[in-house]
């Protein structure tokens, strides 16, 4: 009897919560992440300690959040930290640096290959262009792109942005 082999399916670990009306595509590693309704994470993405709102589109090959290394120590190697590490060796047991929460608002579009540093907040309605490296918070309804990512323009005029923020359509019932 042949067994069905699932190749490259997503790995969803830790305290992750994926809304029943959300999708995570194959090859993605989702760690301690909350994914809101009608949002999707594309193929081969990585998230760690991330909160993602509703109606978000995250393209393939994105990296959002993740662990930090303590650069003020003699070594940045995890063998000098407490807890499990990929090297399975310990020379010291300093506490691990906290992983700050990365927040992606509602109705955010993140292009392919984007990397977002831990602890960043991306406001609702924002767009991040393909291949961007995000090291600063992005306000609502702004378009950013580049390495490092920089402001390109607002998506709408001030009145439209205010209207969309007030309606909070992402909280409406289906």
Predicted feature residues:
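Conserved G/P- and acidic residue-centered "switch" motifs that form tight phosphate/ATP-binding loops
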Residues: 128, 146
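Conserved catalytic segment of ABC-fold P-loop ATPases
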Residues: 123-126, 139-141
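Flexible, glycine/small-residue-enriched loop-and-beta-strand segment within the central core
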Residues: 3-8, 15-19, 23-120, 147
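Short, charge-rich, low-complexity interaction segments located
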Residues: 147-156, 161
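Conserved catalytic-core motifs of eukaryotic protein kinase domains, centered on the activation segment
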Residues: 68-70, 138, 154-155
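Short, intrinsically disordered, charge-balanced linker/junction segments flanking boundaries
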Residues: 1, 167-174
